């Protein structure tokens, strides 16, 4: 059966503290996650074709702490940094941060106060994370280089996990919803982005897990001639608990299909400290 918020166990940190689980008062959860997306194919207007390589690097820091012993509410802050290069530049050029006109941009792009709570007390491993993203970008695109959205975003992420009785398998599900407020100069003005996902993990040992996942991305515009897109993403990865406080994760994913989107792949590494 699934593990509730109030139930103690001898499981490892990576087994017990999924994104569905809230922190107790005085606990801290700090996650540094890095995503490198690179593409050489895209599908727009119903046509799939080769394109010059574009690469988008996103680095986020999420900090949360608990406010009560009953794990009823967590508060946090999300920070996002981006570095993008286009026009056939090498994927690793995102780490040069050279700001070359017409091919590169980088900078801190947004921050977001956030809360995390459990709306149904009888289901302790179902939680919602709400965040209000405040943009630090004036222009989404400069010299043909996109950096990030310049509009406000209200994000809600719905988390649920289920641990199978043998303890070796765990299913984690998420629905990420992002409403982009009306902003005339934003490509996603007055739109809703939905990203459901399912992650199946196998634990050969309590401190190590391998996983596979599937996600779908759907951007729905409420404008008469707004931009819309969709994509299906398949991926795999692993997590390892380095110490009682620190774990590392590696993920790979591939955009296997889509409409009006790039068909690239992502390489991800994250570090999470919980104390």
Show the residue positions of the predicted features.
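Transmembrane beta-barrel domains of Gram-negative outer membranes and organellar outer membranes
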Residues: 3-180, 193-274
């Amino acid at each position: 059966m699934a593990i509730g918020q109030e139930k103690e166990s001898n499981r490892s940190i990576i087994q017990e503290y999924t994104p569905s689980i809230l922190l107790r008062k005085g606990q801290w959860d700090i996650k540094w996650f890095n995503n490198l997306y690179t593409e050489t194919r895209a599908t727009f207007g119903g046509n799939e074709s080769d394109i010059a390589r574009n690469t988008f690097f996103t680095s986020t820091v999420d900090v949360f702490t608990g406010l009560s012993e009953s794990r009823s509410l967590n508060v946090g802050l999300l920070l996002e940094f981006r570095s993008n290069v286009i026009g056939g530049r090498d994927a690793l050029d995102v780490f040069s941060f050279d700001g070359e006109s017409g091919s590169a941009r980088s900078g801190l792009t947004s921050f977001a106060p956030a809360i995390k709570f459990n709306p149904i007390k009888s289901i302790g491993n179902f939680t919602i994370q709400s965040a209000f993203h405040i943009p630090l970008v004036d222009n989404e695109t400069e010299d043909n280089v996109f950096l990030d959205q310049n509009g406000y975003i209200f994000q809600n992420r719905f988390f649920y996990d289920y641990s199978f009785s043998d303890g070796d398998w765990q299913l984690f599900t998420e629905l990420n919803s992002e409403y982009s407020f009306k902003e005339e100069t934003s490509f996603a003005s007055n739109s809703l982005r939905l990203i459901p996902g399912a992650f199946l993990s196998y634990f050969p040992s309590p401190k190590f897990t391998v996983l596979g996942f599937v996600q779908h991305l759907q951007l729905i515009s409420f404008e008469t001639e707004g931009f819309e897109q969709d994509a299906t993403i398949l991926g795999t990865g692993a997590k390892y608990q380095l110490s009682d406080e620190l774990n590392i994760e590696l993920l790979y994913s591939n955009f296997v299909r889509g409409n009006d989107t790039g068909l690239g792949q992502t390489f991800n590494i994250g570090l999470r400290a919980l104390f």
